[in-house]
Amino acid sequence: MRANLAQSIGVASAAALLLPLAPLVPAAALSPSAAAPSARSAPSSPAVPGHTQSLSFDESPKPSAGPRAPGEKDAAVRVVSARTVRPYSLLGVVWDRADQPLRGRVEVRARDADTGRWSEWQQLEAHASGAGSADEGGRARGATAPLWVGPSDGVEARVLPESATAGVSLPGGLRLELVDPGPGEQSGAAQPPGEPKTAEPDRGPGPDKAPDPEKAPGTDTGAGSGSAPDTGTEPATGGEPQTGSDPQTGSETGSGDGAMSGQNETGAVLPELTREATETEYQTGGSFVGPRPRIVTRRGWGANEKLREPGHAYTKTVKAAFVHHTAMSNSYKCSKAPSIIRAMYRYHVKSSKWRDIGYNFLIDKCGTIYEGRSGGVAKAVRGAHTYGFNTDTTGIAVLGSFDKTKPPQRAVDAIARLTAWKLGLFGVDPAGRTWLKSGGGKFKKGRKIRFHTVSGHKDGYVTECPGARLYGKLDSIRTAAAHLQGR
């Protein structure tokens, strides 16, 4: 459902689910020659695996005058006609300027490369106007959240007016981006856990895993919105992010000083640590910090470091975690998670012009945790995940859609383990609340808003992300994470 996308990326609408494929157009109906002249492929240099195809939108044929028939769809104002394309697995729409809104609904459908069947139309959610423009160096494009569709060789897209009577003023440079993640740079990551039989596994984690958030002891913080009225005494807010080429420079940390650890992140996997080993590794001095969970590093999922901008952006501390979902099909295999993450990384950097992937961490349905944005998993790395609240926060995205589908217990447990450790490094109680200063978006810029220290994307931005079913798990996640910290 990058970081400023905050809205991003995490956006969630039931329409964004990958629906069962239905044969709408036979594969033979489209051939490579069907590609419109305006389509251009932009493969990467041979030195950078993967490629991106960029297709321009054409004006839709003018609809006939008169009222539309009952149930007839609104006429599209821009289209990418159905065509055969080079193989790809993820798509999204971009335009020239991030400060220009997309006043229309973008719908896409993809043709399965194996079966030749077309998916149903799926809606893409556009990031807020201005998202990413300041935080990502000022060159960010306007963009929708990306959608993973799996191996595909055909595509069709359309932009529909917001209402039947509304005129449409579209931003310049509107293009459909088709991303092939390519092979990973490394293949040293450990094999992921076995696939859950369904999106709702009936077994919890083993004894060496985090306790079940539904049964963990602790005090319930109560349901409700992640933000409370901004009344009362407010603590001073953190400063602006610092930038430096070395993670050890240009950053200030809060209590716990997680950024000062010298852990080695050059391998494919950071192994799980006991609580005692975590305290020794990160020199937490016996404070409340959960044991470090197993984390697949960027090397482990095959990140090509030539894609992203050099250097890193840091904030002073980490005061809260925002939970997202990626609003994609839940039917993927966990062994494909590295490919999905590589595709998102390429889309955020090459298509949206962000400095790096937007999320700080990603979690697949098997509960495997992946490092996201570069800069150090224990450091206060500024991401692009929750527009208006990327300062002093970390963004965690679960691969899948959880508006109507129950999130797998292994993924829920992984969020608890990750937040117990990450927030603990900075002295934060995952069952507590904190004040954050808005950078714009859902709340007026400069306004101080009170959040749960583990909040959903929808608490900080106008979106349904992380989906109603995952959002409903946040209370139990907070309780479990606090228990893992020894509170």
Regions found by a protein language model. Give the residues of each.
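Basic/polar, cationic surfaces and motifs that engage anionic cell-wall
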Residues: 2-6, 13, 24, 168-326, ...
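Beta-sandwich interaction modules
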Residues: 11, 26-30, 50-56, 72-87, ...
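C-terminal region of N-terminal signal peptides and the immediate post-cleavage residues
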Residues: 19-57
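Primarily mature extracellular domains of secreted and cell-surface proteins
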Residues: 58-72, 96-101, 111-114, 128, ...
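A short beta-strand element within beta-rich, extracytoplasmic domains
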Residues: 87-100, 157
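Short coil-to-beta strand junction motifs in C2/discoidin
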Residues: 101-106, 355
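Active-site acidic/histidine clusters and adjacent loop/turn architecture
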Residues: 307, 316-351
